[in-house]
Curated annotation (Swiss-Prot):
Function as written in the Swiss-Prot or TrEMBL entry: S-adenosyl-L-methionine-dependent pseudouridine N(1)-methyltransferase that methylates pseudouridine at position in 18S rRNA. Involved the biosynthesis of the hypermodified N1-methyl-N3-(3-amino-3-carboxypropyl) pseudouridine (m1acp3-Psi) conserved in eukaryotic 18S rRNA. Is not able to methylate uridine at this position. Also has an essential role in 40S ribosomal subunit biogenesis independent on its methyltransferase activity, facilitating the incorporation of ribosomal protein S19 during the formation of pre-ribosomes.
Binding positions (S-adenosyl-L-methionine): 176, 201, 206, 219-224
Residues covered by region (Disordered): 1-33
Lineage: Eukaryota, Metazoa, Chordata, Craniata, Vertebrata
Organism per entry: Mus musculus
UniProt-annotated location(s): Nucleus, Nucleolus
Subunit structure: Homodimer. Part of the small subunit (SSU) processome, composed of more than 70 proteins and the RNA chaperone small nucleolar RNA (snoRNA) U3.
Protein name, per record: Ribosomal RNA small subunit methyltransferase NEP1
Main subcellular location: nucleus
Length: 244
């Protein structure tokens, strides 16, 4: 669901598995805690099928990606085009920087191709650069959590599957797919006071295929990247809920 990224390739950089502290973005309003099952209006986004896995290179671990490890992937019979952690990075930047998240009305989960489920604390500030994001993901996948720099709060943590166990009871669960024939106006799907789940594919090709969604929708006449899908969804919710 994501177009190939252009521009300059990141400089070669290796990461050892060392625990680091990461910044938080303080909210303007009191927000629901990460993973809260209580009611109240809230958008829950699941980045499904994310390519996040580590590989040992020499004595260090790196986040596997198509640019840095192409020859290794080909040697093991894997399509480099399917190993795109940058899609998750771009999507997280869109989501966590959104006014909807700053207002305390967004919760994000990441479900990887390797069946690892990650909960993202709404106060997490995603690294701006891809290299730093890779280091963060290596730390998370090996330590199972990443804490805030100013306290014991966990900003990212690996949690127990399935993701549906972490949803508010009775909430609507919607998947996004370009293959759906009819186009939906996202604003018409926004509930006035209830939580709702949107599932966005965090991969380069294919479609979302999960058992827990109740309906699938297409939101554009054109195929969209995962990051743009996230931006359109959060913007629609901001418009309906009056988040400026």
């Amino acid at each position: 669901m994501s177009a190939a990224s252009g521009g300059f390739q990141p400089r070669e950089r290796r990461f050892s598995v060392q625990e680091q502290d990461w910044e938080t973005t303080p909210p303007k309003k009191l927000r629901l805690g990460a993973g809260s099952k209580c009611g109240g209006r809230r958008l829950i986004v699941v980045l499904e099928g994310a390519s996040l896995e580590t590989v040992k290179v020499g004595k260090t671990y790196e986040l596997l990606n198509c640019d840095r490890h192409k020859s290794m992937l080909l040697k093991n019979g894997r399509d480099p085009g399917e190993v795109r952690p940058d899609i998750t990075h771009q999507s997280l930047l869109m989501l966590m920087d959104s006014p909807l998240n700053r207002a305390g009305l967004l919760q994000v989960y990441i479900h990887t191709q390797k069946n690892v489920l990650i909960e993202v604390n709404p106060q997490t500030r995603i690294p701006r650069t891809f290299d730093r994001f890779c280091g963060l993901m290596v730390q998370l996948l090996h330590k199972l959590s990443v804490r805030a720099a100013d306290g014991p709060q966990k900003l990212l943590k690996v949690i127990k599957n399935p993701v549906s166990d972490h949803f508010p009871v009775g909430c609507m669960k919607i998947g996004t797919s370009f293959s759906v024939e009819d186009i939906s106006d996202i604003r018409e799907l926004v509930p006035s006071s209830d939580p709702v789940v949107f599932v966005v594919g965090a991969f380069a090709h294919g479609k979302v295929s999960v058992e827990y969604t109740e309906k699938m929708v297409s939101i554009s006449n054109y195929p969209l990247s995962a990051a743009l899908t996230c931006a359109k969804v959060t913007t629609a919710f901001e418009e309906v809920w009056g988040v400026i």
